[in-house]
Every structure is written in C-alpha cells, then in structure tokens.
Amino acid sequence: MLTLHLVFLYVFNRILILIYIITVAETKYIFVTGGVVSSLGKGIISSSIGKLLQARGYNITIQKFDPYINIDPGTLNPYEHGECYVTVDGMETDLDLGHYERFTGIQTTKANSLTTGRIYKAVIDKERRGDYLGKTIQVVPHITDEIKRNVKSLGQKYHYDFVITEIGGTIGDIESAPFMEAIRQLKWELGKNAINIHLTYVPYLRAAGELKTKPTQHSVKELQSVGIQPDVLILRTEKHLEEPVLKKVANFCNVDLDCVIQSEDLPSIYEVPINMQNQGLDTAILRKMGEPIGEKPSLGPWRAFLERRNNAKDTVNIGLVGKYDLQDAYKSIRESLSHAGTYNDRKVNITFINSEYLTEDNVAEKLKGQDGILICPGFGQRGIEGKIVAAHYCRTHNIPTFGICLGMQMMVIEFARNVLGYADANSREMDEKTPHNVIDIMEEQKNITNMGGTMRLGAYECVLRQGSRVFDIYKKEHIQERHRHRYEFNNDFQKEYERAGMQCVGRNPESDLVEIVEIPGMKWYIGTQFHPEYQSTVLHPHPLFVNFIKAAIAQKSNK
C-alpha cells in the first residue's frame, strides 16, 4: 500500500508539473529582421536558430511574415518569388518555410505564414462584421494588433517554448512599417521574453582592401529610429571579421560584443548552424532571455550528415528539365536531390535543361552525360512539348526518370502519343478540345473561377500497390504526400495504359485519383502527381529521391 501511495504521489506530482509548464510557462519570441540589402539569408539564420534551440530540448516553431499585399504567393511568378512551398494543411507559402522544415524537421501550417494581404483582409472582414463597433480603422492600432495577435496566438495555442518570426524585406521598406511597429510594441509588452536579431551586411571593397561597417551602423540606426534596439547582430560577410571590426560594430550599435556574430560565406547552408553554435549564438539568446545555458549540445546526427556530405568524392549527374531557369524556382527539388546524394555518398551535379528549347533534334545532345533526368512541375503551355520530348527520349533510352506533378503528366501524355498511338493526346490544360484527354481537370475544379488558393492543396493519403517498385521503396502500403494541382490522370484510359506497360501503382483511397505511375520493366521510370520534395529533410531524406539517385549511380556505373 505504501508503494502504491508513493507511486500515486509521484504521478500526481508529475501531472502538476506538466500542468504548470503548459499553463504558466511563458513562450519566448525571437524576431529576425534584415538590413542593408535583401537576400542575406534571414531564412537560413532563422532555421539555424531553431535547430540550435531544438537541440537543447526546446519546443520551437518558425513563422514568416511577408510584407507584400498578396494573400499568399500561390499566384506569384517564380521568376520574381522563387518556389511556392506547400504546407501539410495546404497553405501556399514562401520558400523559406521549406528551409524551416528541412533544418528542424517540424511541420509548418497556415499559422506559420502571414502576408500583409492576409492581415488587411482579416481586419477588413472584422470591420464588415461590425467587430470594431463603428471605430475608425487605422494601421495603429488595428493592423498592428492583428499582427501581434498572429504572433502570440501561435505560441499560446501550441505551447511552444520559442516562436521565431522572420520579417521579410529590409528595415526602412514602406511595406514593413506596420510589422516593425508591432515588433516594437511586443518587445515593450513582453520584456525579456522577446528579443530582436538583426541581420546586416558588411561589404568588402576589393579596390581599397577594406571591410566597411558603415552600412551596418546605418541599418541599426534605422531600426532604432522605429523604437527597436537589436539584441543580437549577425553580420553577413565574404571575409573573416577580426575582433577590432566586431568591437567597432558593438560600440557604435549598442550591442554586447558577444552578441555580435559573423556569418561568413560557407560551402553549404547546412554548415550555418554549426558556425552559429561555435560563436555562441544560442547561448547569447538564452542569456538575453533569462534561460539556463546548460551543456552545449553535440548535434551528433547533424555533424554526421555534414561529415558524410563532405567526404563524398564521387559524383552523379542529374538533369532538371523545366522552364524556370531561376534556381530558387525548384529550391525544394534541388535540396532533396542534395540530401539524397549525401545518403548515397555522392555529390550531385545538377544541370538545368530549359524545356522551352528542347526538341527532338537536340535532345540527345542536351541530355548527354546525365545519369538521371527529373522532369519538373509547373503550369501552362510554355515548355510543355520539350518536357514530352525529354520523357520520350528517356523512356526509349532507358534512362532513370522522375516526373513530378506536371512532369508526371507529361510522361503520361508521351506514353499515349507514342505507345498507345494517340498522336493528339494531351491535357485539358493545354488543349481543351483534345479527343484523347489523358490528363483532365478534376471534377471539383470545373466550376472554380478564382485562381488563388483553389487547387488541390496539402497532404492527402495514397495507397500503394503491393509488389510495385514504389511499394518496395516506401516499404509500406499507406503514405501521405503533399499536392498542388488541378488536373489528374483520366481513369477512362487506365486499362489501356496498364495493358501497354505503364502501371497506376498509387491511388487516393477516397477519390480514386491516380497518384503514381511507373513502368516496371525499366531501370527507374516513375511519375508522381504529388510533390515528394516538400517532405525531404536533412536528417530524413525522402525515399523516392534516395532511390532515384541510387538508380542514377547504377546508370553511371553501367555506361
């Protein structure tokens, strides 16, 4: 009885502690801003901070505030904005959320991505409902209050220890002004539970042989002018900064010397967390926020990944067939290939092949030397025929081929034209009058007129056919993958495809939508309607990409 009593007291005590942690423990907020120029890597720094705090046992999340007026980046041109990243709950977001997930392994949601457009829409909707009781709606306090609500609600709802918020753009931008005011207010209200980390640029003037700190000083001055004193400065630089430079920045910017961190150019973005840890960024954050420092985490699995990556000597060549030559347009695909290369002990050389200029006359030359071909996702007519040409060449030459979303659809169309004998086969997206619409618009999409946020988005279940190649790759029957599409494989043609050798080996159990096609007799010829690149992380590479690279390595060995 005494033992049972002691056990009961122990369990009761643990429950009380848990309740205390959940209800009383305060969420800490870290705001990451940028100055001097854009594209300094705030997303990588935010991801690295998240990784370092996570390694210390903290429950973290990272959110991105984009100051543009679009509701989301779903309809933005990839040339302007890069890749549109899709969260598990179907939100179209900035590509930085991909970095957050790949570094930390967390799953982001709609709450992790916010734009000025969504903020204003929420406020206007409230005004129309009468929530403000006839008050004049202004940037301060109504817009800033809505921003603050979105910051704090994320931490309060899910009881995170740390919420890291990256503010897009640079200090001084007109679009960022409401966000900066909201941060100023939050820092005042939350005290030591909120800090600002400001990322700036220290240029090197080659002609003079000097590093210039003046842009950083002006950037901090601009930040101070809106009422925000940075707690930590991170200096992006091409050259190593000696201590006198760091002391100068600390002195003129009112920041502790040990809170001035330099971020040199590194061979890989995945080395940034180690670099930040070596300079004590995580300990500076914890000290500023009144948290215990504890022991320095080893980051063992992360270091093992980097060691394996750096030790890889052999290479494998992968051709990306797409129409956007901006690297960021296929960011998640490139990173997924890189992860898969590391876990196959190979460096992946990626060559972009513009499908707009790919023809039957030059395809052999353009694809020469590639060990595997990935046909990229996309939308619209431009570059489509080039993707079909690539699919035909790869299929007839038995080259490992991976088609994603539109890439898979082009593999299906090519097969219909050249194997099934339907020379006019096409997608309804490209040709509404084609009699052989092997790719058709989804039934639920037919009456939708708005473009933004209306596709089949987010994670859906897929059931794999036992005995198929993809079943062997995943090693399970039921999977979940993320989607972003309006068009689908037309099931009216399924029997013809399967009789001719292209198998439909993955299906959604509710809608019967074909998710995966493969040709079993080939070395590796797989197309997916979903986007597997959204689920590949540093420590958990996606099995399809790992197996694809493995097939490409075998292809290279057999040449």
Go through the PLM ranges and name each one.
Residues 6-9, 16:
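Short hydrophobic targeting helices and cationic amphipathic motifs
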Residues 295-296, 344-349, 507, 558-559:
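Flexible, glycine/charged-enriched surface loops at secondary-structure junctions
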